[in-house]
Amino acid sequence: MNSLYKSNIYQKYRGILISLIDVCIVLFSYLVAYMIQNNFFINEKTIALTKLLALGLFFMLLLHFIVLRLFKTQMSLWTYTGPNEIIRTFLSCFVCFLIMSYFVLKVHLFSIELIALAELLCFIFLLGARMLYRMARRYIVDVDRVDNCLIVGAGNGGYLLMNEIYHNMAYPYNVIGFLDDFKKKGTMLSGKPVLGTISEVERICQENNVRCIFITISSVTEERKQEILDLCTSTSIPTKIMRIFVGNDESNHISFEDIDIKDLLNRPSIDLKVDQIGSYLTNKVVCVTGAGGSIGSELCRQIIHFNPSKLIMVDINENALYMLKQEFLVMKRKKQMNDSIQLESLIVSIREREEIYKLMRNYKPDVVYHAAAHKHVPLMEDRPTEAIRNNIFGTKNVIDACCDCGISRFIMISTDKAVNPTNVMGATKRMTEMYMQSRNTKGGIHMAAVRFGNVLGSNGSVIPIFKEQIKNGGQVTVTHKDIKRYFMTIPEAAQLVLQAGFYANEREIFVLDMGKPVRIWDLADKMIRLAGLVPGRDIEIQEIGLRPGEKMFEELALEMEECHKTDNNLIFVHEKMDIDSKEVDSKLNKLKELMDQTDDKLQIKEVLMDMIKE
C-alpha cells in the first residue's frame, strides 16, 4: 500500500481520482434516496420516473463535482479526517442542496424531500468513506507494527503522540495504552485504554511486552517529573521524553528524544537576567581563554547571543579552536548569529607571558573569561610541575596582563576541588584564587572567580567514560561505592558564569548552587538502564578504589568564607578574604625556585599544599 501512495502517478492524479470517487458516492446516494422514497418498489411508473431523472443526472453530477472541488474536499488527507474536513463536506452538500432545490422548484422534476434526503446521504457516505479508509489504514499499520509502546500521560501530549505514531511510519510502534493518575484509570483515549497509574509502569510493561515508553507529561512539578523519570528508567526499557522547542517560525514544536542523564539530575531552572549580562557584553570586545574546551566553547556559544562587537577565542588546541570557529561561520551563513560579530581565533599558550601581554595590548578586550586550565586529577598528581606552570603561573600571566593593560572585567573559572584540596589540581586552583584576591584593583578592574563542581559531558569526565564502557559491553568502573559529586550541565554552568560576571566587583569568589550531590554508583546504574540494560545482569558495576588525591565528597566553600545571596537564587558570593599580596608573591617565587631546582613530585606537592593553608 505504501508503494502505491508514493508512486508518481498517484501523486499526480490524486485530486482527480478522489473527485471521481466522490462523484460516484454522490450518484450512489441519489439512487439510494430515490429507492427509499419509493419504498424500494419498482413498477412501470417508477421506471418512467427513473428515465426522467436520468435526464438531469449529468447536471447533478457536474454540479457536485464543481462544488466539492471548490470546497477542496479532494485536497484533504483521508488519514487525517477531522473537524475541518467534516465542515467542508457539510457545506458542499448544503450548497448543492440549495442549488438543486432552486432548479427543482423551476422544473418540478422531483421533490425537495428527495433532494434533502439525497444530500444527507451524500454527507454521510462521503464522510463514511473517509472514516472507513482511516480505520483500514490504522488496521494495516497495527499489523505491520509488532513493537508495543506505552504512553505516560493521557492528556493533550499523549493524544498528539498517539496520532503521530499512527500517521507516521517512522514510529514502528503499536500503542497498547496509556498511564496516568488514578482518576483516569479505566477511561479511554482515542480507542486506547488508560491501563493504570504511573506507579504501575513496571508491572504493565512486563504484562504487555512493552518495548518503548513515551513520556508526554510536561505540566508537573520538577519533583513529580523526577519521580516519573525514575519509575520509567527503572524498567530498563528504552524511554523517550517529549520536548517543546521554538522553531524558526516562532511557533512551538514537539519532538521526542531519548532520556539523557541530565534529565535524571533534577536540576533547577535558571532565571537569567539577560539585561544585566547584556550590559557588560553587548558591543564589547570579549576574550575567552581555553575557548576550545568544554566550558570555554560553551561560554563562546552563549556570549554570541549578547552581540559583542568582537569575540577573541584563545587556546593552545588548534583543532578544537578551528572547529569552534567553523561552527560559528556556519551559524553566520544560516543567519543564526549577528553577522557583524568579528571572530578571532588565536593559538596562544597562557604560559607565554609576553604573548598574553601582546594579546591584551593589541586587542584591548573589555571582558576576559579565563577558562584555560589543566583539570584531570590523576594526570596532575603524576605531573605536579605541569599543573603548577599552567594553572598557577599561566593564570598569573593572564591576571597580571589584565591589571596592567586596563581590562575592565576579569572572570576566572574555578572548581569545588579548590575547597580544602587533597590533590594537586585543586591546590593549584586554590592558589589562583588567592593570587586573584591579593591583587590591587584600584585601577578599576572588576575581578571574580566562579567556583562549581563537575559538568556533565565535559571532555574526559565520568559521563562519556561510562557511555564508552557501556557501549563496549564491559564493566562500568566506579572508584568507590559511596563517592558523591556535584553535577550541572555545561550550558547551565556557562550561563551562570555569565550571570556571575555581572556581579563581579572586587575579587569575589562566587559559588554556584549545584543542587544535591549525586552518588556516582547510582549514576552508573541509571546510565546502564538508559541503555536498555540491567545492572548486574547485562553489565556489572565494579568498584576499583579511590585514585591518588581523590576525595569521597566535594565541598563548595571553606568554613571561614562567609556566604551571601545574590539576586539570583543559584549564585552565592563569598566575601573576599584579606590576603597579603607580598606574601602570595613570595610563595610563588619560592615555588618557582623549587621547580627549577628539583623534579621531586612529593616535595613539590608538599610545598604547594603548605602554601595554600589559610
Describe each region flagged by the PLM:
Residues 249-251, 370, 376-377, 382-433:
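Conserved Rossmann-fold NAD(P)-dependent oxidoreductase catalytic core, especially the SDR/UDP-sugar
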Residues 226-240, 310-317, 361-362, 382-409:
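NAD(P)-cofactor binding segment of oxidoreductase domains
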Residues 27, 133-240, 316-325, 330, ...:
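A solvent-exposed beta-alpha-beta segment
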Residues 225-287, 403:
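Flexible, Lys/Arg-rich cytosolic regulatory linkers and terminal tails that connect or flank
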Residues 7, 14, 271, 276-280, ...:
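Strand-loop microenvironment adjacent to phosphate/nucleotide-handling motifs in alpha/beta enzyme folds
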Residues 1-145, 173, 234, 241:
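Signature of alpha-helical transmembrane segments in polytopic membrane proteins
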Residues 286-302:
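N-terminal Rossmann NAD(P)H-binding glycine-rich loop of SDR-like oxidoreductase domains
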Residues 347-366:
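Conserved Rossmann-fold cofactor-binding substructure of NAD(P)-dependent oxidoreductases
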